[in-house]
Amino acid sequence: MARYTGPLTKKSRRLGTDLVGNDKSFERRPYPPGVHGRGRTKDSEYSLQLREKQKARYAYGVLEKQFRRYYEEADRAQGKTGDVLLQILESRLDNVVYRAGLAATRRQARQMVSHGHFLVNGKKVNIPSYRVSTHDIIDVREKSKDLPPIVIARETFETRDVPAWLEVRPNKGRILVHQLPTRDQIVIDVNEQAIVELYSK
């Protein structure tokens, strides 16, 4: 199954949530694409659960097979399955780069990681799905510090809302992972319990 690479704004409108982050096009038209003015039929429980899964999948850019593996891992772990699932997704390196404000979107962050622009604890990591751990140190590689997204991140850092579980030192191009995120630190418009119910059937 190929990764979806089309316009995310259309997916955002269909699923009713901003999958990109500060998507101006979605803000202007937050209703489903197509003909407007028709009343919506009541969604079934299954379709509501499926929508929540799709929202999470598209937001984090994860394929179905990988998403299911994340769910199965979360289901085996201690704690609430839905909370653990979101923690796993948030802990991906591409998401951490995005949350730290070093990329404008997760897609851009994924591309930057894939191109080898980051070190984790001093070693180059080019796998977007790499999972960070508490006390990890993520650095922009020296030769990558003049990349436009990194320069923009330094210049606009004061306007970024970085989650408390991360610390960013923009002038050094460094991200410190103080802890893994708790549910209340994960800002995503998704009902994770609906995802759990979908996979539990």
UniProtKB/Swiss-Prot annotation:
PROSITE patterns: RIBOSOMAL_S4, S4. Residues 1-45 are annotated as: Disordered. Disulfide bonds: none annotated. One of its GO terms (cellular component) is small ribosomal subunit. Residues 91-157 form the S4 RNA-binding domain. GO terms for biological process: ribosomal small subunit biogenesis; translation. Belongs to the universal ribosomal protein uS4 family. Part of the 30S ribosomal subunit. Contacts protein S5. The interaction surface between S4 and S5 is involved in control of translational fidelity. HAMAP family: Ribosomal_uS4_B (MF_01306_B). This is Small ribosomal subunit protein uS4. It comes from Cutibacterium acnes (strain DSM 16379 / KPA171202) (Propionibacterium acnes).
